[in-house]
From Swiss-Prot:
Name of the protein described by the UniProt record: 14-3-3-like protein E
Any single biological process term in GO: signal transduction
PANTHER family with a match to the protein in the record: 14-3-3 PROTEIN
Species name: Nicotiana tabacum (Common tobacco)
SUPFAM superfamilies listed in its UniProt record: 14-3-3 protein
Biased composition (Polar residues): 262-272
Biased composition (Low complexity): 250-261
Family stated for the protein in its record: Belongs to the 14-3-3 family.
Length: 272
């Protein structure tokens, strides 16, 4: 693909984002990603890819949670006819979720991870790999759920090994990984202790080096720290867990930034 075509696809992806046509945004960024056999995506390109998939998957995840909640209510009322219809509809949403996850996971494995050359890009893509296996684990059952959870754990651990060795504790990608990894422990593995320990360690390590934060990443990093703190507050009533912040740290709105997704526990998807 010629460079001009790559630039054109990036432009069209931005246009699709503005129009909130995220399926098309995914298509444009997939074309870009498939050109990176030698030269990897720029930071802007990988963030566009992340935003595109985040919005496409996010809509289905929200639909699945709503339908699952309705299904539980109808089951408790004994409305078997309704339950049968809901299960069929939920299956349709799950098929869409599987297709989306398979699409980005294949792209990561075949194009993006193999050519990642910096610690930052390696952690970014491995975290992304873990995220989309985690989304599969949210609705899969039995052996498929176990496999998705194992794949999530492997991807997050691989990313963590690199992040701890090569990225600063305040780096937004390292913090975003810690946030999502802790959500995985809490929501998928039902391990609140490991979730809290991981989140608190990441938070404390970042607080200790907050003075070293540059202006460029200050907003992203402090926002993710806020999300870590919010989750710790949600997950534990242990008063020995210190959640105090230094005076320099100004909490920001915990709503999702451009590349963030928030649910019961808050996780981070994008440029971090």
């Amino acid at each position: 693909m010629a460079e001009s075509t790559r630039e054109e696809n990036v432009y069209m992806a931005k246009l699709a984002e503005q129009a909130e046509r995220y399926e098309e945004m995914v298509e444009f960024m997939e074309k870009v990603a498939k050109t990176v056999d030698v030269e990897e995506l720029t930071v802007e390109e990988r963030n566009l890819l992340s935003v595109a998939y985040k919005n496409v998957i996010g809509a289905r995840r929200a639909s699945w949670r709503i339908i699952s909640s309705i299904e539980q209510k109808e089951e408790s009322r004994g409305n078997e006819d309704h339950v049968s219809s809901i299960k069929e509809y939920r299956g349709k949403i799950e098929a869409e979720l599987s297709k989306i996850c398979d699409g980005i996971l294949n792209l990561l494995e075949s194009h993006l991870i193999p050519v990642a050359s910096t610690a930052e890009s390696k952690v970014f893509y491995l975290k992304m790999k873990g995220d989309y296996h985690r989304y599969l684990a949210e609705f899969k059952t039995g052996a498929e759920r176990k496999e998705a959870a194992e794949n999530t754990l492997l991807a997050y651990k691989s990313a963590q090994d690199i992040a701890l060795a090569e990225l600063a504790p305040t780096h937004p990608i390292r913090l975003g990984l810690a946030l999502n990894f802790s959500v995985f422990y809490y929501e998928i593995l039902n391990s609140s202790d490991r979730a809290c320990n991981l989140a608190k360690q990441a938070f404390d390590d970042a607080i200790a080096e907050l003075d070293t934060l540059g202006e460029e990443s200050y907003k992203d990093s402090t926002l993710i720290m806020q999300l870590l703190r919010d989750n710790l507050t949600l997950w534990t009533s242990d008063t020995t867990v210190s959640l105090s912040l230094s005076q320099k740290y100004t909490p920001t709105n915990a709503d999702a930034p451009t590349n963030n997704t928030v649910h019961t526990s808050k996780s981070f998807l994008g440029s971090a």
